[in-house]
Amino acid sequence: MANADVLKVSILGKESIHCGFHLIPYIAQTVLSNLPSSTYVLVTDTNVANFHLTAFEKEFEQRISSLPTSSTKPRFLSLVIPPGETSKSREGKANIEDFLLLHRCTRDSVILALGGGVIGDLVGFVAATFMRGVRFVQIPTTLLAMVDSSVGGKTAIDTPHGKNLIGAFWQPEYIFIDAAFLETLPSREFSNGMAEVVKTAAIWNEAEFISLESRSADIFAAIQTPSADYAGRSKQTRSIAQELLLSVIVGSISVKAHIVTIDERETGLRNLVNFGHTIGHAIEAVLTPTILHGECVSVGMILEGEISRQMGILSQVGVGRLNRCLKAYNLPVTLADPRIASLPAAKLLTVERLLDIMRIDKKNSGPEKKIVILSRIGATYEPKATVVPDSIIAKTLSEAAKVIPGVPRHHPVKMATPGSKSISNRALVLAALGKGTCRLKNLLHSDDTQVMMAALNELKGASFAWEDAGETLVVKGGEGSLSVPPKGKELYLGNAGTAARFLTTVCTLVQSSPQDNAEYTVITGNARMKQRPIGPLVTALQANGSKIDFLESEGCLPLAIAPQGLKGSQLQLAASVSSQYVSSILLCAPYAEEPITLELIGGQVISQPYIDMTVAMMKTFGVDVVRRKDPVTGKFLDVYEIPKAVYTNPPEYNIESDASSATYPLAIAAVTGTSCTIQNIGSASLQGDAKFAKEVLEKMGCQVSQTATETTVQGPPIGQLKAIEEVDMEVMTDAFLTATALAAVANGKTRIIGIANQRVKECNRIRAMIDELAKFGVETIELDDGLEIIGKPISDLKRGVSVHCYDDHRVAMAFSVLSTVVEGTIIEEKRCVEKTWPNWWDDLENKIGLTVQGVDLASVASEASASGTINHDSAASIILIGMRGTGKTFVGNLAAATLSWTCLDADAYFETKHEMGVREFVHQKGWQAFRDAEFEVLRELIAEKSQGHVISLGGGIVETPAARELLKEYAATKGPVVHIVRPIDEVIRYLNSEASRPAYDEAIVDVFRRREPWFGECCSHDFFNRFGDLPYSSPKATSREIARFFNHITGQRPNLAQNLTSGRRSYFLCLTYPDVTQSFPVIHELTQGVDAIELRVDLLRASKDYDSIEYSIPTLAYVSSQVAALRRVTSLPIVFTVRTQSQGGSFPDAAEKEAVELLKLALRLGVEYVDVEISLSEKKIKELVSLKGSSHMIASWHDWSGNMIWDGPVVKEKYDAAARFGDIIKIVGKANSIQDNFTLYNFVSKVNSTAGSKPFIAINMGLEGQMSRVLNSTLSPVSHPLLPSKAAPGQLSFKQIQNALHLLGLLPAQRFYLFGTPIAHSMSPTLHNTGFEILGLPHHYELLETKEVAEEIKIAIGDSAFGGASVTIPYKLDVIPLLDKLSPAAEAIGAVNTIIPRTTGSGRMLVGDNTDWLGIKACITEQLSSKPIHAALVIGAGGTARAAIYALSALNVGDIYLYNRTTSKAYELAHAFPHAPVHVLEQLGQWPNGAVPPCVIVSTVPASATTTEEETSGILLPSKLFDYRDGPAVVIDMAYKPAETPLLRLAKTAGDNWATVPGLEVLLEQGYVQFEMWTGRRCPKELVAKWLGRLTTDHKQFVFEEECES
């Protein structure tokens, strides 16, 4: 059995690496024979043990038992440890060492490491240090460990500061590579190891790399066929696939072994094996354990290759080859890969974070970062890692770019652009279909050509190989022989439109075969590709007999194409949208069953030069196409005759440079007044865009000279480009974006026509240019087939613009031209240029000579939650669906107002477009015509209004299958689709009274039942629109909930617990009612002090089930109604929990499906926190993670048994599992003694100290565990005495925990003050002390009345117990010198009424703030909710008036009118707010001509200074102040003596729409704000207000701090 044929590899002068198949007997024999010992210890993990431990134990025991009896027989011990990176720690090492000591192992022991890289690194380090070093053997079981970590003697453990930071070089005695182990390895793990194999070939051996490039399918096949009866152990039984696999492994190992032999201790050369690891390890530090080591290194290799390209060392050819090779092994090559981008942790991959992690790297020298730089495939720039500045690394890592304006340093520029995309794709198709071998030179290395080659490869249409270091592609044509890809394999084309159109016809050439296991070929693409039209081409092919089905939207990808061959003969094609439809048929026509006559119909043919190019290229490949002529006029007709033939491949075909790409460097010369020469493109070019220089740039004032193969442009002086009155760009449509960018800075108006087809490219390019130019302040006018651009001087353009590129390469490059003269322009999505010019940004700097900087959008954007993930752009438009009459328009208007967006009703849009209402349209043309037109409107809205809109759709949109698919795709990839839900009985009542829309042909309830499932499948969210009044909810509850919901789901302002995100102590209340409405009478008391409220869904029970003994799972409808009801009485975030019986709840453990449905419902309802038990299947958890949007996931584990030990391996295992998925981790055990709480506390302290740790809820249940509830700082679950029961044993109330924290010294008592005079009758102490008492806070608020700001106040604020102070007249200015900093509000208002002590890294800081404006703002928003405020009036010009103007500015009021008796003071105040729209009124009540009267009035003068009587002193208040009648309005009088001032009295007579707010309410509001600023807790305002109300009734002399100012 032990006679195995092995390949031996030498390392450090010893043949210690033995490679083969089924080697366990060989390993046992070799170890026992050559490494005599008293004890052999095999260490493995639980995963590997399940597969291989028994075989090792059996083999060693048999061989030990057969040893001579005369000698002492050695022992064979085994230790199984938990799997995963967490075992590779100081504790993991100590556990193994303790095992060895316990079993009295000595220095002659031999340790065998059986497992992956973690086991090898860890056990190797144990061997290096145990008894000062013992012998060990590596037996790697993963491909990654075989080719990387097991070879070279590196051993290490991880620390919280990084991976492998503590370790030693300790060479194993043997390394046994048993490739049969790979048969049990998941394919993802195999790919993980292939990253290291590709890396080794890339740095050292190009021949090996070529083999890896071309044989990926064979290599994968080698591990997918199990070897029966130990096949492969001997050479005679070894298959060809096994030989290939072994050669790949041995080849990779040999390179590393050679390098290690030369440089064992990594002083230079050994650095090379870290190619891809500098950046890869940084990525891994953030994404571990979800993304594997090899996957991170794969991305790292591409990024480090791009750094080399940026440095001018590696060509784009090399980067492209590396990219393709890694993709062939299913490895990610970009951080945008869905496997990475969909993870919550991906949000943490900021440039700053990655650079910070990269600082701790063993290759570095001090602060200098070192990266292995490739010079070409198979060679490195230096025989060691190279020092690379942070700026270069940051530029590559950044997702956006900024061009620094200036004159190109390399002027005059002379350069060539990449190969033409159009010609490259045509050449690939021609050569693949042709006979013989063709060498393609100057092929474009881009995303587009990569997907084309990959698709042709999948179709088995040709074979591809590289020569000349990748500069030449060798294509061996398949002569038109094509095969259906295997079942389940789709041809994924991304956003490559050219590939999609060409391959559609190519796939019709496929003939069915008995070997096929699929019935058709499926072509698909990304979300935008699925919107781009391909209908005319498909229609033409279908009419010719091809069977092609649209799988989703009609007229778009994906397509299913049956293998029936192309029939031929007569074809008619509409060619007014894309010339690529024509080229697609032309290219494939020779392979039809009959010669083809192709007739183009449907109006003017688009881009004729590109059709001519196709015909010319076909001729080069041996097929002549005849274009018919009119026999009378001799003019060409749009009819083409193509014979049956087979292309004959020319030996070599040189691809012309891309003319569209050439427009960008030429345009840079034009706009910067410099010279640029483009080689390989001139007047002889077949490409239409080659005319750009003569037809556009010359007319704009440039000097243009052109030969047959070269074009030179000299721009006019900067700022002197001329506008072109009109230019028809129909023959060069792609170049219109470049022309548009130049026209923006030209003198005059430019009109561009002939480009209608650009609306259906990668994006709607005409709209994209219009929208993005508007950010610069450039005016444009959209035309039916183009646009007009009104140019502006460069100096007048707005600076610092961030350009959205719509994932469109041409948009990005066009705006990079404009950015060369406009400072601060940020080009988002810089990587979208990889479609046609992957190294554009490098060439811009290296060849043109303009500095390009990377921009990390994460640091530019406002800081978001570290763990939240939004699956869409937060500006993505929201689509509302639902039955007619559910309130979509009502909700949409309020949502749009909240977000400052535009609400767009699809019915109104339809009416404008078709110039008739829906009812009339249906009457004239019927329902089907209406549904078709309605669907087109939906497509148009999604394309045209993709951002900043709330779009309300008609209820019947879901009747159209294509519309449902479009809505589902939008919800999955673009933005929220919200289903507005309303009880059906309310809907019926409303519709029976409504007459503006066509009546249904059937009962409303039947329509509802049919559509309800469709609404559910199309939406990403549900919003319950409750119209009826709910007891204990405020009248404004609906509008407040709409604001909360839409701010949350868009990610604009997620409704998360602020104390949690800021790191302070946080709590949630556990509701235990079967019906939450039972809590509403006491909801304000229940929620005192907490940050969130838990809805225990497993405890819910509808009233009909109260008497039932059996547990009944609550229905989705009941749970939805409970959430909706709770939303109307509290704005606190909801924690949605479905606790199962085994984890202490009531939900059945076996009902996983029902639990997941409820959790999905929570995410659809926009619930903020969703508790997900990690006992659910991983697949279900990942599905929930993918849906969570702005919601956060609490990954929880509960163990009621009392057996869970906080310092045992199980807790760490559960913690790591929860950390993979959760934004917050929750582990709950049961305390058996008080000591268990200290063990818990130590565990929490340890995991919280690691970099990037997540918020952690750790609690022990039971009476003995109450201390853990006090010490827990993250979302502690609390009860309340008013609840019917506690949710868990040992639960405490919020107040009890505060008392305990105080007794433990964790919540010291603080002193708060009111500074001012006179203040004896102030109610501020009552307000704050009542709040402290209710919440159980140990603080005290008192008066400090002094004659001046003197020593007493200085002593108070200097005391360590000082918690904060209110400041009133006359000290609002006098205290400022005592403070360290003022808030922006205090600076703008010019006064301080609040002092807040803040702790910083350098000590304590006193911050002055002003909360007056927040009190005013709160009172306005309470009455007007999210309604936009068109105009407001402020009366007075003192300090309170400043606060009012500041508040109104914060509310984005359209116009602020200011009146004061002393007009000069009013103007003085207006000048203090230069950026606010303040208009001084000469006469009160006289508004500017045509202006709408204000809907907000704030008076800041004493009541005694106002009057409603003529002929009396004071400001006369005219009744026309309250002329506004078009909606809710509010008047605030800051005076509170008397309770009803003349202004408020007048308002009450004005109209029902005017709400009145007395000054006392404002003062209370600003006091509540102060309370929260100081304590971090919301003031229990309802209870405080009740108490104060009683006091003010009983003691009229009690007042607040100040009267209003005159």
From Swiss-Prot:
Pathway: Metabolic intermediate biosynthesis; chorismate biosynthesis; chorismate from D-erythrose 4-phosphate and phosphoenolpyruvate: step 2/7; Metabolic intermediate biosynthesis; chorismate biosynthesis; chorismate from D-erythrose 4-phosphate and phosphoenolpyruvate: step 3/7; Metabolic intermediate biosynthesis; chorismate biosynthesis; chorismate from D-erythrose 4-phosphate and phosphoenolpyruvate: step 4/7; Metabolic intermediate biosynthesis; chorismate biosynthesis; chorismate from D-erythrose 4-phosphate and phosphoenolpyruvate: step 5/7. Residues 1-390 are annotated as: 3-dehydroquinate synthase. CDD domains: DHQase_I (cd00502), DHQS (cd08195), EPSP_synthase (cd01556), NAD_bind_Shikimate_DH (cd01065), SK (cd00464). Its EC number is 4.2.3.4, 2.5.1.19, 2.7.1.71, 4.2.1.10. GO terms for biological process: amino acid biosynthetic process; aromatic amino acid family biosynthetic process; chorismate biosynthetic process. GO terms for cellular component: cytoplasm. Residues 403-850 are annotated as: EPSP synthase. HAMAP family: EPSP_synth, Pentafunct_AroM, Shikimate_DH_AroE, Shikimate_kinase. This is Pentafunctional AROM polypeptide. It comes from Laccaria bicolor (strain S238N-H82 / ATCC MYA-4686).
